[in-house]
C-alpha cells in the first residue's frame, strides 16, 4: 500500500495539473512583446548599472549577458572562505550575497552571487513602459535598494 501511495503521490504532485496547463495555454496566447521588451530593458539596464559601478573597485566581474545574477570576485578580500566574506559583507553593509561555494565554485575564491532584482518589477515596468531609455534616476526611484547596495559594496571593497 505504501508503495502504491508513493507512486500516486509522485504522479499527483510532480506534474502541473491539467486545469493549470489549460489556463497557461490561454495566458500565453497573444502578443507579449511589449511586456517582454519592457522587462528586458529594465533587467539589462539594472545589470549594466551594477556591472559598471562594481567593476572599477578591485572587483572582477563579467559583463552581464542576461539572467538575474552577477558573480563578482572581490580580489582584495582576505577571508578563509567566500561564506565568511559574505557574512562580513552582510554584517557591515546589510547587503546579502550568497557565497560562490554554494554554486560549486572554489571556497577559497572570494566570489559571491549577487541578484540585481530587489525592486518592485510591476511598478518599475508600469512607470517606464513607453520610454526608450532608462537612466540612473529611474533606478534611484524604482530600484533604490540596488543603488544603495552597489554603493555599500563599493565602499566595503575599498
Where would I find each of the regions flagged by the language model?
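PLP-dependent class I/II
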Residues: 1-158
